[in-house]
């Protein structure tokens, strides 16, 4: 099979991201042969590696691929990326920030870097699908809650916050309802204290 023919058949899958195993089945070749074909296609800039065994097309926005990175677990865009999307911070993040029930991990790809942060299943809510239903974005309230919640963790990764302006659509009532769902009373109290400080300065 020629490289061009292989590329045509892979495009027939109609997927934004595809696994080496899927390509092997679709092309009717072994996994090692499929891997070799994909590496050659990458050398010619036809496909892009995301992580081991996962590929995508050039010029695909990384934001639309986060669920593929965390599969089989779901994820949604949050933290700095969602705060910027909602106009709550002015600095453009150079990393795509997501939360997921998957473990915390950072993926550096040719398309950019995705930073995935673990949330417990009981806090995996407060997001909306985009119009194409290919990716999900945290609401303004949930993006802030995720930021404050993860700042209370042992790593203190988000302990320092950027200057935040509350979006016009931000609902204090919805935010308070979300805070009440934090199962750990100590972390719930910590998040509420940080929020009160932020709201007092806003």
Tell what function each PLM region has.
Residues 57-202:
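Nucleic-acid-binding surface
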Residues 1-75:
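Short beta-edge/loop segments at beta->alpha junctions of small alpha/beta modules
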